[in-house]
C-alpha cells in the first residue's frame, strides 16, 4: 500500500512542495527568506484579522478605534505592534530575498522572477493602504501626497485621483475603500505566492554556485525544514524584541496626532521601507518624471534578466560583480537615509547623485562589468 502522504490528492501537493521536494545540497541561509516571507504573510493575515474585529473604517472613529485596541482589547497592544512591526520584518525579508536573487542570478528563472516583482508591487500597495488606516497625521497626508502623484498622468490624471478618493479630497470614502483593499490584498498575495512556488518548482531551486545541482539533491525535509526553523527563530526573536522593547522605533510620532486636513506636518515621509523610492521620486524636479522614476525604481528589476551578459550565473566567482552589488546596497541605504531627510541642501544633491548611481549600476555598469569579466577569463 502506498503511503497516504504520496497518494492522497491534497496531501500529495504538500508532500511534493515541503517534504519530498528535491533541493540542492549546498543552498545557504540566503535561501531561508522565502519561507520567512511565508511566515510573515501568515502572521500579518492572523494579526490583521484580529485587528479588523475591533477597527472601524470611519474618519470619525478610526483613530479612536486603534487607541481602543491598544488600551481596552485583551492583548490588543501586542497584536497591533506585531502587525505594524511585522510589516517591517516582511520588508526586511523581501529586500534580502530580492538581493539574493540579484546576487546569485536567480532572475534567470523568468516566470518566478516576474511573479516575484508583481508580489513586491502588491505587498507595497498593501503596506501603503495599511499605513493610512490608523488615520493619524502621517496616514492622512501620506495618502494625500501619494495618491496625488497619479494626477501627473496626462489627460486622465485628475479624474483618476478623484475616482480613487471617492470625492474631492482624501475623506471617509477613501478610508473605507482602503480598508476593504487592505483586507483583500493579502489573500491575493497568498494566491500569487502559490503561483510563485509553482513556477519555482518547475525548474527547481538555484544554488550559490549557479551550476545545475541535478546530480546532487537532498529531500527538503528534514534538512531544510530544520534550517528554516533556525531562521524563523532568529526572525521571531528580532520581531518580538522590537515589539516588546521599542514598538514605536520605526514609526512616526506624527501618526499619534489625529488626522487634520487643515494642518500639514513639517515633513511628510512614508514608512522606512519606502524611503529609497521616495528619495528617487523627490530627486526629480518634474512631477511626471518623478512618478515615472518611482515606478521604474522597482520595474527596473524586470529588465535585470535581459541585461545579464556574464557567462556565469551568480556573483560567487565574480569579484567585479560583487563590488558593484555591494555598491548598489550602499546606494540603496544612502537613498533610504535621504528619503527621511528634509528637502534642502545638501540632501537634494546627494539624493540626485544616489538616484543616478542606482539606475546606472543596474542598467549600464552591471552589463558592462559582466562583459569585462568574460574577457578577463579568456586571458
Swiss-Prot record:
Task: Name any cofactors this protein relies on.
Answer: heme b
Sites where the protein binds a ubiquinone: 201
Where's it found, cell-wise?
Mitochondrion inner membrane
Residues binding heme b b562, per UniProt: 83, 182
Keywords, A to Z, come to:
Electron transport, Heme, Iron, Membrane, Metal-binding, Mitochondrion, Mitochondrion inner membrane, Respiratory chain, Transmembrane, Transmembrane helix, Transport, Ubiquinone
Q: Which domain of life is it from?
A: Eukaryota
Entries under SUPFAM superfamilies matching the protein: a domain/subunit of cytochrome bc1 complex (Ubiquinol-cytochrome c reductase) (SSF81648), Transmembrane di-heme cytochromes (SSF81342)
Q: Which GO terms describe its molecular function?
A: metal ion binding; ubiquinol-cytochrome-c reductase activity
> What does the note under cofactor report?
Binds 2 heme b groups non-covalently.
Report the transmembrane regions from the record. Answer: 33-53, 77-98, 113-133, 178-198, 226-246, 288-308, 320-340, 347-367
Q: Name one Pfam family in it.
A: Cytochrom_B_C
Q: Which InterPro entries match?
A: Cyt_b/b6_C, Cyt_b/b6_C_sf, Cyt_b/b6_N, Cytb/b6-like_sf, Cytochrome_b, Cytochrome_b_C_euk/bac, Cytochrome_b_N_euk/bac, Di-haem_cyt_TM
Q: Which annotated residues bind heme b b566? A: 97, 196
One BP term from GO: mitochondrial electron transport, ubiquinol to cytochrome c
For membrane topology, the record states: Multi-pass membrane protein
Record-level GO cellular component terms: mitochondrial inner membrane; respiratory chain complex III
- Similarity field: Belongs to the cytochrome b family.
| Record text on subunit structure and interactions | The cytochrome bc1 complex contains 11 subunits: 3 respiratory subunits (MT-CYB, CYC1 and UQCRFS1), 2 core proteins (UQCRC1 and UQCRC2) and 6 low-molecular weight proteins (UQCRH/QCR6, UQCRB/QCR7, UQCRQ/QCR8, UQCR10/QCR9, UQCR11/QCR10 and a cleavage product of UQCRFS1). This cytochrome bc1 complex then forms a dimer.
Other noteworthy facts: Heme 1 (or BL or b562) is low-potential and absorbs at about 562 nm, and heme 2 (or BH or b566) is high-potential and absorbs at about 566 nm.
| Record's function text | Component of the ubiquinol-cytochrome c reductase complex (complex III or cytochrome b-c1 complex) that is part of the mitochondrial respiratory chain. The b-c1 complex mediates electron transfer from ubiquinol to cytochrome c. Contributes to the generation of a proton gradient across the mitochondrial membrane that is then used for ATP synthesis.
Official protein name in the record = Cytochrome b
Gene responsible for this protein:
MT-CYB
Amino acid at each position: 500500500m502506498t503511503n497516504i502522504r504520496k497518494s492522497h490528492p491534497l496531501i500529495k501537493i504538500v508532500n511534493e512542495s515541503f517534504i519530498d521536494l528535491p533541493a540542492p545540497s549546498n543552498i545557504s541561509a540566503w535561501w531561508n527568506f522565502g519561507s520567512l516571507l511565508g511566515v510573515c504573510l501568515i502572521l500579518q493575515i492572523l494579526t490583521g484579522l484580529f485587528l479588523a474585529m475591533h477597527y472601524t473604517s470611519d474618519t470619525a472613529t478610526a483613530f479612536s478605534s486603534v487607541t481602543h485596541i491598544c488600551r481596552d482589547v485583551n492583548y490588543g497592544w501586542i497584536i497591533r505592534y506585531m502587525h505594524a512591526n511585522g510589516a517591517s520584518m516582511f520588508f526586511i525579508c523581501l529586500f534580502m530575498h530580492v538581493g539574493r536573487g540579484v546576487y546569485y542570478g536567480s532572475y534567470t528563472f523568468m516566470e518566478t522572477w516576474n511573479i516575484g516583482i508583481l508580489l513586491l508591487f502588491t505587498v507595497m500597495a498593501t503596506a501603503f493602504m495599511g499605513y493610512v488606516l490608523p488615520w493619524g497625521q502621517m496616514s492622512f497626508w501620506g495618502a494625500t501626497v501619494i495618491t496625488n502623484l497619479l494626477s501627473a498622468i496626462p489627460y486622465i490624471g485628475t479624474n483618476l485621483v478623484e475616482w480613487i478618493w471617492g470625492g474631492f479630497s482624501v475623506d471617509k470614502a477613501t478610508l473605507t475603500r482602503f480598508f476593504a483593499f487592505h483586507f483583500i490584498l493579502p489573500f491575493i498575495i497568498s494566491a500569487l505566492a502559490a503561483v510563485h512556488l509553482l513556477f519555482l518548482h518547475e525548474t527547481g531551486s538555484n544554488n550559490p554556485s549557479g551550476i545545475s545541482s541535478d546530480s546532487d539533491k537532498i529531500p527538503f525535509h528534514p534538512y531544510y525544514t530544520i534550517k528554516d526553523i533556525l531562521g524563523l527563530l532568529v526572525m521571531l526573536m528580532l520581531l518580538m524584541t522590537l515589539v516588546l522593547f521599542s514598538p514605536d522605533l520605526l514609526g512616526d510620532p506624527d501618526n499619534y496626532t489625529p488626522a487634520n486636513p487643515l494642518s500639514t506636518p513639517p515633513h511628510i515621509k512614508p514608512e522606512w521601507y519606502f524611503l529609497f523610492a521616495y528619495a528617487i521620486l523627490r530627486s526629480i524636479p518634474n512631477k511626471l518624471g518623478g512618478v515615472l522614476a518611482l515606478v521604474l525604481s522597482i520595474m527596473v528589476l524586470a529588465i535585470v534578466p535581459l541585461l545579464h551578459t556574464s557567462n556565469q550565473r551568480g556573483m560567487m566567482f565574480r569579484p567585479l560583480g560583487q563590488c558593484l552589488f555591494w555598491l548598489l546596497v550602499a546606494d540603496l541605504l544612502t537613498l533610504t537615509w535621504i528619503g527621511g531627510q528634509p528637502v534642502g541642501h545638501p540632501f537634494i544633491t546627494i539624493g540626485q547623485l544616489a538616484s543616478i548611481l542606482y539606475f546606472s549600476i543596474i542598467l549600464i555598469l552591471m552589463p558592462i562589468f559582466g562583459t569585462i569579466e568574460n574577457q578577463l577569463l579568456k586571458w
